[in-house]
UniProtKB/Swiss-Prot annotation:
Gene name of the record: OPG038
Carbohydrate-modified residues: 49, 79, 118, 154
Protein known as: Early protein OPG038
Keyword Nucleus appears in the UniProt entry: no
Induction: Expressed in the early phase of the viral replicative cycle.
Length: 220
């Protein structure tokens, strides 16, 4: 008799455990987007002819209010830090443009155009004299001079560098993730632009990123 009661109790418990009721969750208002925070163009003195799927790798961290991202690919290591910020890097993509130019799209969790940030960028030529420092200087913001960007270049392969924060355009064919990134930075006075050139004219380092093909960087 006791065995039958235990068996009935187990059956009843099993029947209760699989019972499922649909729960209607309230809609989200704070959608999680990737914000198109910056575009970095780097010219090199060796041939890079087209975007290579799987070439770019990335790692990111957020320590003591400093957001950092490290990218490797196309013979370069790019190390970028945004100081004293609430956001962090969430993704990056790289694409090859004309005349051996590499374009890097950088995405963060929040917009950059509300607060001026100091930025540090180190570019290392992985295959050409990577142990020598070619350039190390603090560049004032060339548009509004409200923040600064220090750029360090290790090696002899870089011909020009241009960094634009809060760009107002993006490749219409870039779909990673589809409909989940924003780039409508309407406050022009909050945008920034930094540039340095060695061989190329700086205007040759200004790519039309709407014409490039990009590949998302693989997260390590």
């Amino acid at each position: 008799m006791v065995y039958k009661l235990v068996l009935l109790f187990c059956i009843a418990s099993l029947g209760y455990s699989v019972e499922y009721k649909n729960t209607i969750c309230p809609p989200r208002q704070d959608y999680r987007y990737w914000y198109f925070a910056a575009e970095l163009t780097i010219g090199v003195n060796y041939d890079i002819n087209s975007t290579i799927i799987g070439e770019c790798h990335m790692s990111e961290s957020y320590i003591d209010r400093n957001a950092n991202i490290v990218l490797t690919g196309y013979g370069l290591e790019i190390n970028m830090t945004i100081m004293d910020t609430d956001q962090r890097f969430v993704a990056a993509a790289e694409g090859v443009g004309k005349d051996n130019k590499l374009s890097v799209l950088l995405f963060t969790t929040q917009r950059l155009d509300k607060v001026h940030h100091n930025i540090s960028v180190t570019i290392t030529c992985m295959e050409m004299n990577c142990g020598t420092t070619k350039y190390d200087s603090d560049l004032p913001e060339s548009i509004h001079k409200s923040s600064s960007c220090d750029i360090t270049i290790n090696g002899s392969c870089v011909t020009c560098v241009n960094l634009e924060t809060d760009p107002t355009k993006i490749n219409p064919h870039y779909l990673h993730p589809k409909d989940k990134y924003l780039y409508h930075n309407s406050e022009y006075s909050m945008r920034g632009s930094y540039g340095v050139t060695f061989i190329d004219e700086l205007n040759q380092c200004l790519l039309d990123i709407k014409e490039l093909s990009y590949d998302i960087c693989y997260r390590e």
